[in-house]
């Protein structure tokens, strides 16, 4: 959530920054400012009426001591109380509406974020690894998986509908090996592993920014008023909801493996075939809770930690800086890591590493006490390390052989016996 104080103090800066994402956000800021002015006016009026009520109450006390009639003053106080009550109801409505508007305003962008309209304007930062060359006709991961009897899309569809899959035997073991490998590398890099709930309260998703804006993307359990998590970022960040940390506790580094659940409501017709875009998929997540002064150094560290996984797996990838029109709602700056997918002859996203600055911390009330004793909001960062299903896709396609086998990356030999599956 953007600070209302910042909007009040420097509205033009806020509007210009948000306009890099969407010109129409300027109007929302104007609406918030009008409501804020109305709110402050009503607060002032309530305070004045309370002062008047108190003064008249004292006057009544004085008159009663003198044995004088106080009926007219008592009627005035009754009317004042009615007006205060009415104003307080109006104030509560204004504050609720203002909060609703603020919760739908995205984060401010860091000055280094490139301007652009969509993913075509993202800026490539680096490439790593050699793109493999094949002397045979390659298969995409879906066809290869079905051919080998490792993936069953038809039965998954019969069980659950479209965009689900069943992994079998060696491929299921390879996915499990990847999860363990990723968690162990993350632990080596100083992240504490956690096992977190997969069902969360609505307010938990408000804290990380998925609600209220992206409700249609989420699976909701109505009877229990709980949502299935779209990413482990949600419970990991909220571990410190309504908490005041010690400055010396920072940074806090967390990692978790979870299945993730997304309705993909806006993805009709995209990646219909295969494992790239599923309603349920495995992901290993990284979250950092850090001091505001070091959050951009921590973003580079987060990116490096996610890259290390791909480097150890010897999978070619590139890093892009997301432009203003493609960056996520809660992020101030984001790097995407895109892995090479031979069958598509292009790089595809496998991780997003974002600095949300204090945007999530304000929504989830996450603070730390600095050395002067002042409570300040922390900065939060998150990144995939990695999307397991897409990593599996990349291995299947980049490591495939002429006889339709899949070679095992060297670093996974401790997890899976043999050269190929």
From Swiss-Prot:
Source organism: Hydrogenobaculum sp. (strain Y04AAS1)
GO biological process, one term: selenocysteine biosynthetic process
GO CC terms in record: cytoplasm
Oligomer and partners: Homodimer. The tRNA molecule binds across the dimer.
Binding site for L-serine: 231-233, 285, 384
Binding annotation for ATP: 262-264, 349-352
Pfam families according to UniProt: Seryl_tRNA_N, tRNA-synt_2b
Pathway: Aminoacyl-tRNA biosynthesis; selenocysteinyl-tRNA(Sec) biosynthesis; L-seryl-tRNA(Sec) from L-serine and tRNA(Sec): step 1/1
Record-stated family: Belongs to the class-II aminoacyl-tRNA synthetase family. Type-1 seryl-tRNA synthetase subfamily.
Record-linked NCBIfam families: serS (TIGR00414)
Cellular location(s): Cytoplasm
MF annotations from Gene Ontology: ATP binding; serine-tRNA ligase activity
Record field: catalytic activity: tRNA(Ser) + L-serine + ATP = L-seryl-tRNA(Ser) + AMP + diphosphate + H(+); tRNA(Sec) + L-serine + ATP = L-seryl-tRNA(Sec) + AMP + diphosphate + H(+)
Function: Catalyzes the attachment of serine to tRNA(Ser). Is also able to aminoacylate tRNA(Sec) with serine, to form the misacylated tRNA L-seryl-tRNA(Sec), which will be further converted into selenocysteinyl-tRNA(Sec).
Keywords tagged on the record: Aminoacyl-tRNA synthetase, ATP-binding, Cytoplasm, Ligase, Nucleotide-binding, Protein biosynthesis
Enzyme Commission number(s): 6.1.1.11
Main location: cytoplasm
Name the UniProt record assigns to this protein: Serine--tRNA ligase
Entry remark concerning the domains of this protein: Consists of two distinct domains, a catalytic core and a N-terminal extension that is involved in tRNA binding.
